[in-house]
Swiss-Prot record:
UniProt key word Aminoacyl-tRNA synthetase: no
Subunit organization: UreD, UreF and UreG form a complex that acts as a GTP-hydrolysis-dependent molecular chaperone, activating the urease apoprotein by helping to assemble the nickel containing metallocenter of UreC. The UreE protein probably delivers the nickel.
Cellular compartments annotated: Cytoplasm
Family: Belongs to the UreD family.
Main location: cytoplasm
Organism: Yersinia enterocolitica
Protein name (record): Urease accessory protein UreD
Sorted UniProt keywords: Chaperone, Cytoplasm, Nickel insertion
MF (Gene Ontology): nickel cation binding
Gene for this chain: ureD
Function: Required for maturation of urease via the functional incorporation of the urease nickel metallocenter. Expression of the urease operon increases the likelihood of bacterial survival by contributing to acid resistance in vitro and in vivo in BALB/c mice. Y.enterocolitica enters the body via an oral path and must survive the acidic stomach before being able to colonize the intestinal mucosa.
A Gene Ontology term for the protein's cellular component: cytoplasm
InterPro entries: UreD (IPR002669)
Length: 325
């Protein structure tokens, strides 16, 4: 059975074809024996639209399809009381073979939003097919978005492909974070970098307006990890580290220099952490990367960068970190 293609700036269907023509997944096109790919409960979809209303922003529209869901927006950020904070939840508790997931997040003009996850995302062991995820973010004029999920943990023999597109107005700001773990390294000797494929693509375009095609391409970053074909422990890749953090900050050029001045390169092999920031093409923003021996160290580095970005762009800082995070 053929699968419909993803088209346009948002994903509103229940199925997508991401991964079918990906060379890195060519040998993983077989149908799962347990439940067919993109079946009931395996085609998750989540749409979140945030809008400005008087003194604060609100979650104005929400659409969900299992296993993806959210609950109501909360306002727990005391430094930004106008900021709606939404937690994405999976009713399945993990990502399984044959899963096809998609997310649309829209921040309308002048609105703000913070989106996170309830916990780390696990990509379970697979014996057929793969899992895929499409993410689309649109941030309109003067909008502000923070997308700060917890780490993703690929289990042994798993295959996962993700494609992220950010459409952003030149006056808007978006901070997009992702943290990838080496696997469940304390669970089994073969779990550390035991996954088959992890493929990630992130691209950004200028937002031209609603119902308009995507504007100028600002940058594209893609990497494909196949640790069973090529070791990730090499110098210049992961070396001895087990956690990788990647943060994309898209914001007007006027903020870049001040942020970079406060984010020096950091390399401490004994302390198990390395991080640094640089500019993205087309003066569209900055990219910050961190390596660590565990998720805690990488998350701390990301939080510090996030804090600096907020202070320089909005003039407000982060609230105290929750004890359970």
């Amino acid at each position: 059975m053929s699968e419909p293609e993803y088209r346009g700036n948002s994903f509103t269907g229940s199925r997508h074809a991401l991964g079918i023509n990906a060379p890195e997944l060519a040998q993983y096109q077989d149908e799962p024996a347990q439940m067919r790919r993109r079946g009931v409960g395996k085609s998750g979809y989540l749409k979140l639209r945030f809008a400005k209303r008087e003194h604060r922003s609100i979650l104005a529209e929400m659409e969900r399809r299992v296993p993806s869901m959210v609950q109501k927006a909360l306002y727990w950020d005391e430094e930004m009381p106008e900021l709606p904070c939404v937690t994405m939840i999976s009713t399945s508790g993990c990502i399984l073979q044959g899963d096809r997931l998609a997310t649309d997040v829209i921040v309308e003009a002048g609105a703000c939003a913070h989106v996170t996850t309830q916990s780390a995302t696990k990509v379970h062991m697979m014996n057929a097919n793969y899992a895929s995820q499409i993410q689309n973010f649109t941030v309109e004029e003067g909008g502000y978005l923070e997308f700060m999920p917890d780490p993703l943990i690929p289990h042994r023999n798993s295959r996962f492909i993700t494609d992220t597109t950010i459409n952003i107005h030149p006056t808007a700001t978006a901070i997009y974070s992702e943290v990838l773990m080496s696997g469940r390294k304390y669970h089994h000797a073969d779990e550390r970098f035991g996954f088959d494929v992890y493929s990630s693509r992130v691209a950004a375009h200028v937002f031209l307006g609603k119902e308009q095609p995507a504007g100028k391409e600002l940058f594209v970053e893609k990497y494909v990890l196949e640790p069973k074909s090529e070791s990730l422990d090499a110098i210049g890749v992961m070396q001895s580290f087990d956690a990788f953090g990647n943060v994309i900050l898209l914001t007007p050029k006027e903020h870049h220099e001040r942020i970079l001045a406060r984010v020096p390169a950091h390399f401490d092999i004994k302390g198990g952490i390395a991080s640094g920031a640089t500019r993205l093409p087309n003066d569209c923003g900055l990219v910050f990367k961190a390596l660590g021996i565990d998720s805690a160290g990488v998350k701390n580095e990301i939080r510090q960068f996030w804090k600096i970005a907020r202070e320089e762009i909005l003039g407000v800082t982060l609230p105290e970190k929750f004890l359970w995070r």
